[in-house]
């Protein structure tokens, strides 16, 4: 089980993304194995906005979120007060963006690795959690 950052989801939906193939293959492998993938509910608007922005097609952003919601092995975690406080602490201590801190906080709370392509998030979160990229994980 892994927490999946929006960068991985977005790369899987944007064919021109340099990480598209690795992201697609990793996610497909998780679905095939029936492995649970976890993201905060915040991932949905992040995915929709980034996909629509990068493709200049708003319908693709919505379609991407619908595809995520249809995955049989997805667990979307609400952003409650406990996770928000943890993310606020992480954002302050590690100097990461608020949304990035939510993913890091969720991985920390669940004691599972974070899967991301975001280099800054990766470097700053490593003292707190295991952070990996799809190209180094089965």
Give residue spans per PLM region.
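Acidic, PIN/NYN-like endoribonuclease modules and their adjacent C-terminal/linker elements
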Residues: 1, 44, 76-77, 104-138
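Structured helix-beta-strand junction loops
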Residues: 32-34, 71, 110, 128
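Short glycine/serine/threonine/alanine-rich loop segments
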Residues: 35, 96, 112
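Short beta-strand scaffold positions
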Residues: 4, 38-39, 78, 98, ...
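Acidic catalytic patch
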Residues: 15, 41, 62-93
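His/Asp/Glu-enriched, well-ordered alpha-helical/loop segment
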Residues: 47, 55, 70
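Short, well-structured N-terminal submotif of metal-dependent ribonuclease cores
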Residues: 1-39, 54-66, 137-138
């Amino acid at each position: 089980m892994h927490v999946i950052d929006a960068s991985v989801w977005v790369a899987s939906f944007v064919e021109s993304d340099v990480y598209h193939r690795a992201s697609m293959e990793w996610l497909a492998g998780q679905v095939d194995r029936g492995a649970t993938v976890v993201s905060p509910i915040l991932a949905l608007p992040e995915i929709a906005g980034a996909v629509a922005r990068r493709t200049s097609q708003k319908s693709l952003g919505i379609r991407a979120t619908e595809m995520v919601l249809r995955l049989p092995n997805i667990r979307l975690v609400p952003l409650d007060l406990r996770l928000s406080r943890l993310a606020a602490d992480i954002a302050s201590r590690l100097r990461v963006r608020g949304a990035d801190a939510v993913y890091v906080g969720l991985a920390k709370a669940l004691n599972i690795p974070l899967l991301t392509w975001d280099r800054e998030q990766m470097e700053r979160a490593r003292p707190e959690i295991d952070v990996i990229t799809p190209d180094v994980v089965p």
